[in-house]
Amino acid sequence: MEKDHLHNPDSLGDYGLETVKMIKDRFAKGVDRGILLMRHSAREYRRDIHDLQNPLTERGRDLALRMGDMLGADLKMRGFASTAQRCIDTADLIMRRTERDVRGERSKTRVTRVIEAFGVFYALDQVRMWKSLQAADGLDSFVAKWLKGEVAPDVMMPARVAVSQILSVMKGRLLTISSEKGRSHSLDLCVSHDMTLYLVRQAIGLETTFEQPVNYLDGLLMFETDGELRVSSHYGKEVCVDDFINT
């Protein structure tokens, strides 16, 4: 394995810090397993390649490594991601920092698995979707119109159908988490895109697209408590999502 790129955590800004705090606070309250639907780390914005091919920047890689350091080695972690390489790399880099066995030694490398539900599966016509995005007043406006049913149904899957699919897959991940000796908590990373986070967050009744941004490494945490499936954001809101899942 190549040596991790050295980084100065004090120079990386706040990306991911509130997400880590949300996870640790929830585990401290008695939850022992969770699913984190999160945005990838800092990326490039090249115009000469397809947008989904834009990779992480060096700073983005450092941010992911720092997040892994902060989550700590006592977590049992699995990685899932969209097909975009920047999402896969984000999960890989975070897990790299938590790959320690019960003796504190580096364990076998875990591999991030691609799951299409964390990609842009809801875009039925990507060319027209990109054109609609460019015509809209920002991504937040586009997602708001999508949720209102104002985007053509042959361009985007109905928003609430997409949300149900995403939450169903997350629930499936939660049900398959098992305990591991030496680790008290389990977390699945599900790395996706800001559009997915904006969509799910507003649809389930958390922050709207206009209230709060979705920054790099922001996430929504799914967990079970008191017989309910719940999702929280690091901004402090929390909702039950059982009614949003068609299972």
Language model: regions and residue ranges:
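A broadly tuned preference for mixed-charge, low-complexity surface segments
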Residues: 82-97, 136-150, 234-247
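Active-site or metal-binding loop neighborhoods of secreted/extracellular toxin and effector enzymes
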Residues: 155, 207, 224, 228-247
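Active-site-adjacent alpha-helix immediately C-terminal to a catalytic or transition-state-stabilizing loop
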Residues: 164-231
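Active-site-proximal alpha-helix that buttresses catalytic centers in soluble enzyme cores
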Residues: 1-112, 211-233
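Generic surface-pattern signal
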Residues: 25-29, 96, 148, 168-175, ...
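Short low-complexity stretches enriched in small and charged residues
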Residues: 34-38, 136-146, 175-190
